[in-house]
Amino acid sequence: MRRSLVAMAAVLLSCVIGGANEKPPVVQDLIHATPAKIKKAALAMLVLDGYTVAYYTASQLRISRQWSSEETIRFNTHHWTNGPVSNCQHVLTLILLPVGLDQAISVTMHRDTVCHADGGWKIWTGDNEKDVQWMQTTLANLKAKIEGADQRH
């Protein structure tokens, strides 16, 4: 029960940290590892998909992947009534908060898309079902990779 309350508090805190009026969809889980180990494993997993570090602190990892020209063309074609976008990136943020005394870390993940448009920057939150499913799968794979490796040692 205590873990559930602490985990819920971590999710609520991560929404406050974001500062948005609307709460973006997030995926959250507890991982029994140090923040450094979680960050290292996340980068090892996601660098294969073209992600690089955009921002790094003790409690947050933000990584991004530049859109391909095909993705940009497809987006601009699909949204032809809007102005064209360029220099788009998928941005994945992991917020890492310690939970209790058993070295568990609450990992909260959310995904945004950032594009240059109309002389400024536009940000879209990954709130569709496909994005949420991707985050759930990615976080589950990250947890399995870390905790599975710990059990083998």
Describe the predicted segments one by one:
Residues 1-4:
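Positively charged n-region of N-terminal signal peptides that target proteins for export
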Residues 6-7, 69:
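General helical structural elements
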Residues 7-15:
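Bacterial N-terminal signal peptides
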Residues 17-153:
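Ser/Thr-rich, low-complexity intrinsically disordered terminal regions
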